Amino acid sequence: EICACLVGSEMCIRDSYHSSPNWRLPYPEKEAKQLQELVKVAQENEIDFVWAIHPGQDIKWNKEDCELLLAKFEKMYHLGVRSFAVFFDDISGEGTNPVKQAELLNYIDEHFVKVKPDVTPLIMCPTEYNKSWSDPAKGYLTTLGDKLNPSIQIMWTGDRVISDITQDGIQWINDRIKRPAYIWWNFPVSDYVRDHLLMGPVYGNDTQIAHQMSGFVTNPMEHAEASKIAIYSVASYAWNPQKYNSEKTWKDAIMNILPDAATELEFFAAHNSDLGPNGHKYRREESVNLQPTAQSFTESYIKNKTYTEKDFSILQETFSQMIESSDILVAHADKNPIIVEIMPWLYQFKLLGETGNEVLAMVKAYDKNDQSLFMRKYKHVKALQQQMFQIDQTYNQNPYQPGIKTAGRVIKPLIDQTFATVTQCYNQKYSTLLNAETDYMPHKLISDISQIKNLPLQVKINRIQISPALEVIKWPGNGSLTIELDQVYPGENIEIDFGKPEIATWGSLEISANGKDWSKVNFTQEKNLLTASLQQKPIKAVRFTNMQHQEQEIYLRRFIITIDK
């Protein structure tokens, strides 16, 4: 699995033999040969292949583990690797000790890196790898700055896990680590919004800070081909930040990737760039050229039931172009692997365009008092919505953010709001009860935990789930999370996995039939999995609370409520 493409001609690979608990083990012969071949191809293409090890979760700060790590590096060296990194990110416990980290890294630097003239400077990713997670009072970053050998490069994601790099932000970290930061820019990585594609322009990073960085890393999506648009752009930024032109580079990248259908791919990418609501609160512009028309039409139609023919015509043309571009791109599937990767999103994009045109047809039919045409178009819209639902439930069914979302920032809200408005108008005028709902989330997540409160909920038939988070969650003392259901349901069970075995010592699980009165629920535990049988008890809300005053560290791997619908 590629975890990061280090522009400036570097590549970093992460796999099951780089991290706990297998980091001490050698690669099996087959995997070692594959890795050796990959390193060889990288070198032939003038790419520094960086191999990273992630030992922090179970490392023992003793001579034995130190020598095991050094031995692993030697094995990788004999496979051709000449660039190395040690990651201490997303861990908890004793492995986060900055003094011990520095001692280990300095030992590697002095007994491995510096004795081999063809090995590049060592890279490390700290436990506190962004400003929002740092605790200056504990001095973690300043300890690294003081104790790490000056040649060791320290990675940094910015003010938050997902953030653009600013002048103030880079100065803040450099002052503490006493060296230029090695920026790990978490874009276009989508492992927290896996139902979205991030294919828009690369922008937001300060163009005057090149001298304050020792490196710049782009973390790609799991879609290697679709990530090339952003990688191309970040490479251009890293080559010469001061002369970087976001829009031109984006267009050039698309032309380079798919010259025979660049117009269509550019159109699709322009409407598939935002991340949607997410726990990191990082958003991107989307449908930029359509935004003024969409805002004008939506405000006028929802408030006054009026619109200009110019706005209407632009929307019609946009929806038609969505259909056409999808078909043209699908026809290129045998010519470029990027189309195979994004195929489900192309299906969804086309259906959304068809839905948009039919919703506009409903508007015209209503204006003309043509009930027959209105009902025909209404039924077609509902059928298209069902098809989009099936695609969302069928493709890309990962355990984190399953499904297929497209054009979600401007186009889909416009279509949904217009459909709801015209259907409600029709119901009022003709005393009908047509369903005006589009897809929506009926349930609510409420929390005073900053890393949890913005996470999206998922609904799959009778299961309500909090989208899992990959990083360590710091759960404050007496903090809680609550899932509030839209109505009372018979409860079947609750499953919780916080990645730690001692949850029962500090956590309390409760249910409520009215959202006001709470009763504690007992649960069974097998390793890290907590299970509570609700035995058809009525539930309107579920709450989990840290009953202690001190902060707890968890991994939010599973929180699922199963109801009887």
At which residue positions do the language-model features occur?
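Substrate-binding groove of N-acetylhexosamine-processing glycoside hydrolases
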Residues: 107-133, 141-443, 521, 538
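Acidic (Asp/Glu)-rich catalytic clusters
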Residues: 33-46, 74-80, 144-148, 172-177, ...
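Disordered, acidic Ser/Thr/Pro-rich linker "stalks" and the adjacent N-terminal cap
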Residues: 411-414, 427-491, 497-507, 515, ...
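Trp- and acidic/polar-enriched beta-sheet ligand-binding modules for extracellular glycan
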Residues: 502-564
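Aromatic- and glycine-enriched glycan-recognition loops and surfaces
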Residues: 4, 17-43
